[in-house]
Amino acid sequence: MIIVKLGGSVITDKSEYRAFRKDVTARLAREIGSSGKDVIVVHGAGSFGHIVAKENHLQDGLSEEGQIPAAARTMCDTRELSSMVVEEFLAAGIPAVSVPPGSCFVMEDGKLIVGNEETIRRLEGLGIMPVMFGDVVADRGRGFGIVSGDQCMSAKDRKSVV
């Protein structure tokens, strides 16, 4: 199994809020599909995650109630981006589905803790490519935190410590 990272600055224009680079993503999906390899895709949040998260200091965890709507907006936006990425893989003939990190991972005081990866393993077993992404996730100590696409990649094969 190969894990491929699609950088957020590659699939979005990070200078413009929610600017998806459909043509670039479609080309990457075709190239990944033509490789014939079993792949898990992890993508960055780009302009769908970084702008609102940075403006509201979400990376520091919950410090004021006003951050909650921003955390929810960021989660909604990153899921929308992931859906767009998945659509490009489907258009390229690759069965793919978005797997939000919050469904597999939890953080504790800013540190990623690997949780239940059964969903990912079962999708792989069915021949469906999991697509994960950087996102806001629950944090046991801070309320919420930011998990990056890179953290998803490095955590993929670690054993659970939950």
Label each PLM-derived region with a short phrase:
Residues V10-T12, G46-I51, C104-M107, V137-D139:
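Short, active-site-adjacent cap segments at secondary-structure transitions
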Residues Y17, G46-L62:
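Glycine-rich loop at the start of a catalytic domain that most often binds anionic cofactors/ligands
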Residues M129-V131, V136-R140, F144-D157:
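Conserved mixed alpha/beta catalytic, RNA-binding, or beta-rich assembly cores of soluble enzyme
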Residues H57-V136:
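Ligand-binding beta-strand-loop-alpha-helix segment within the catalytic cores
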Residues I3-G7, V42-H43, V99-P100, V131-F133:
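Short beta-strand segments
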